[in-house]
Amino acid sequence: MTNLNLPSIFVPLVGLVFPAIAMASLFLHVQKNKIV
C-alpha cells in the first residue's frame, strides 16, 4: 500500500459518512423534540 492510495479512499468515505451521521443525528434530534 502506497501513501497516495489511502487518502483516495479515506476522503470520499469521510465525505459521505460524516454528512450521513450529521443528518441522522439532526433528524433524531428533531424527532425527539418534535419541532417539525
Curated annotation (Swiss-Prot):
List where in the cell it is found.
Plastid, Chloroplast thylakoid membrane
The answer on whether this UniProt entry bears the keyword Transmembrane helix reads yes
| Pfam families in UniProt | PSI_8
One GO cellular component assignment for this chain's record is: chloroplast thylakoid membrane
> Any stretches that span the bilayer, and where are they?
10-30
Q: Which GO terms describe its biological process?
A: photosynthesis
Q: Which InterPro entries match?
A: PSI_PsaI, PSI_PsaI_sf
Provide this UniProt record's keywords sorted from A to Z. Chloroplast, Membrane, Photosynthesis, Photosystem I, Plastid, Thylakoid, Transmembrane, Transmembrane helix
Q: How does it sit in the membrane?
A: Single-pass membrane protein
Family, as annotated:
Belongs to the PsaI family.
Q: List the HAMAP family hit by this protein, alphabetically.
A: PSI_PsaI
- Record function comment: May help in the organization of the PsaL subunit.
Q: Which NCBIfam families match?
A: PS_I_psaI (TIGR03052)
Which named protein is this? Answer: Photosystem I reaction center subunit VIII
Q: What does the organism's lineage look like at the top?
A: Eukaryota, Viridiplantae, Streptophyta, Embryophyta, Tracheophyta
